[in-house]
Amino acid sequence: MSRHKSKSIPGRNLRLADQIQKDLAGIIQREIDMTRAGLITLSGVELSADYAHAKVYFTVLGAEPDTAAALLNEKAGWLHSQLYKLLHIHTVPTLRFVHDPQITRGIEMSMLIDRANRPGPHSGVPDEPEDQS
C-alpha cells in the first residue's frame, strides 16, 4: 500500500487567510450597516487545517466588543455566501467572529507608558530641577 503525499501548497493557508480578511473587510464596509457596532477593523483570520472553519479576529472602537461580535456572528451565514461568490475555492470556511484583545491590550499599555513618561506630580517622573544659579 502506498502513502499519499500531502498536496498542500506551501503558504496557502496564510494566503487564503489574508484574502478572506481582505474580502470580508470590503463586504462589511460596503454592504452591512454596522452603526450599532462601532468602527470595526478585522485584525486577522485563523483557518483550520482543512479550511472548513475560520476564526475572524476583530477590534472595535465606539461600541462594546460583545455587541459587535453578536452582530457579526448574526451575519456570518450571509457573509459566507458573499465570500463564496468572490473566492474560487471548493470549500469556503464557516465564519466565527472573535474580539481580538491583543490590540486593546496594546493600546492600554501604550497609554500607561505615555502617562509614565509625562512629567508632573502624579506621573512617577520627577519634574526638571530648577536652575539654582
Curated annotation (Swiss-Prot):
- Highest taxon of the source? Bacteria
UniProt similarity note: Belongs to the RbfA family.
Transmembrane parts of this sequence: none
Q: Which cysteines are joined by disulfide bonds?
A: none
- Subunit structure comment from the entry: Monomer. Binds 30S ribosomal subunits, but not 50S ribosomal subunits or 70S ribosomes.
Q: Which GO terms describe its molecular function?
A: ribosomal small subunit binding
Q: Name one GO biological process term.
A: maturation of SSU-rRNA
Broad class of where this protein is predominantly found? cytoplasm
Give its localization.
Cytoplasm
Q: What is this protein called?
A: Ribosome-binding factor A
- What is the annotated role of this protein in its UniProt record? One of several proteins that assist in the late maturation steps of the functional core of the 30S ribosomal subunit. Associates with free 30S ribosomal subunits (but not with 30S subunits that are part of 70S ribosomes or polysomes). Required for efficient processing of 16S rRNA. May interact with the 5'-terminal helix region of 16S rRNA.
